[in-house]
C-alpha cells in the first residue's frame, strides 16, 4: 500500500 503524501 502506497499513499500519495
From Swiss-Prot:
Keywords: Amidation, Amphibian defense peptide, Secreted. It is found in: Secreted. GO terms for biological process: defense response. The modification Methionine amide is found at residue 5. Expressed by the skin glands. GO terms for cellular component: extracellular region. This is Electrin-3. It comes from Litoria rubella (Desert tree frog).
